[in-house]
């Protein structure tokens, strides 16, 4: 059976900020974050994570309010439930919350939990709110709204209470290497750029669109990728696009020694290696650790050449980025130096 898009929306800034937090939660704060390659914006739900081959979906509904009642939270689950009873297979259901009532949780210290940590009274209200909202929606067939089905669904939902500032989500992308970006204002500026990029994805109209297979969602361009987000962060830090064509000025000293007929091939190989290193999900932490080390050395020795910086990088740190070889790492150093230093 096909899937029909209904109730896509445009948000105020506060809601947009919160959707960005929800997306960055998927990117960095789950044990299975490394499996997520695409972040689909306001198509299936506020945010839906998707793996590289469109076989797995992480469905997220966000609710920025910190004061909603248990019944209101139940109402907010309606789109997740709609997807649950659809013919598409969603791997995980998440509601990302700005806050919950004091009487909502059994253990108030848990910010990521399932229905087993919700008090019986609150859970009853959640169920009531969800049932009422489902009944009001024309896009959920009445025979699918049963207590048994709703209760089964609630056992699958993850409740995530946001306990972080925007800057914290960016720190997680750069793997908490504080030397890379020194101030929270810079981190917030990066967060805002990601938010704006995410909001741009809503400029197309998809209300009423029907798709037969999950992968068809990519045809509508309402997605960001893990790689795009990392690249955006890196661009902001070094004030340039590291994947841009051309030879960085500090690298010319190395290129000039290379046989002329082999130069273009060597440069292209360096660019490919940098691209693979940046987009290697399994080595993301090592990439940012290496970047921090290069960044620190360049700040300490701004007038020294690429070979000098290369010789002072810890070999253990280099080994954590298997996509680089000697020349491509020197190329990366040159790219960073060109962006950071006049």
Residue ranges and their predicted role:
Residues 1-10, 65-311, 325-327:
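Acidic metal-coordinating catalytic centers involved in nucleic-acid phosphodiester chemistry
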Residues 1-21, 340-342:
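N-terminal intrinsically disordered, low-complexity tails enriched in polar/charged
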Residues 35-37, 55-58, 89-93, 327-329:
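Generic structural motif recognizing short loop/turn segments at the entrances and edges of beta-strands
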Residues 25, 309-342:
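Hydrophobic, glycine-enriched assembly/anchoring segments
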Residues 12-13, 17-79:
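Catalytic centers of nucleases
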């Amino acid at each position: 059976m096909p899937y029909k898009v209904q109730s896509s929306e445009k948000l105020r800034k506060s809601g947009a900020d919160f959707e960005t937090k929800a997306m960055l939660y998927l990117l960095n704060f789950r044990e299975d974050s490394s499996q997520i390659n695409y972040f689909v914006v306001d198509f299936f739900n506020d945010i839906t994570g998707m793996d590289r081959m469109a076989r797995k979906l992480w469905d997220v509904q966000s609710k920025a309010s910190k004061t909603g009642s248990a019944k209101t939270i139940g109402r907010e689950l309606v789109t997740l439930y709609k997807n649950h009873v659809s013919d598409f297979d969603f791997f995980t259901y998440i509601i990302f919350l700005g806050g919950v009532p004091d009487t909502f949780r059994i253990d108030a210290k848990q910010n990521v939990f399932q229905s087993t940590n919700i008090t019986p009274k609150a859970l009853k209200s959640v169920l009531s709110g969800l049932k009422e909202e489902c009944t009001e929606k024309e896009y959920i067939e009445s025979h699918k709204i049963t207590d048994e089905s709703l209760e089964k669904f609630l056992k699958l939902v993850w409740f995530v209470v946001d306990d972080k500032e925007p800057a914290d989500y960016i720190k997680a992308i750069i793997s908490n290497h504080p030397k890379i970006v020194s101030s929270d204002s810079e981190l917030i500026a990066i967060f805002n750029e990601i938010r704006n990029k995410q909001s741009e994805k809503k400029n197309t109209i998809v209300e009423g669109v029907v798709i037969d297979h999950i992968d068809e969602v990519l045809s509508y361009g309402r997605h960001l990728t893990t790689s795009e987000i990392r690249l955006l962060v890196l661009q902001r830090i070094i004030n340039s696009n590291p994947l841009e064509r051309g030879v960085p000025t500090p690298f010319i000293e190395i290129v000039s020694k290379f046989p002329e007929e082999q130069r273009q091939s060597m440069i292209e190989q360096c660019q490919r290696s940098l691209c693979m290193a940046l987009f290697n999900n399994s080595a993301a932490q090592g990439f940012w650790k290496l970047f921090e080390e290069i960044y620190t050395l360049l700040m300490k020795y701004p007038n020294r050449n690429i070979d000098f910086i290369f010789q002072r990088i810890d070999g253990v740190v280099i080994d954590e980025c298997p996509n680089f070889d000697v020349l491509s790492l020197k190329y990366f150093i040159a790219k960073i130096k060109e962006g950071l230093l006049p």
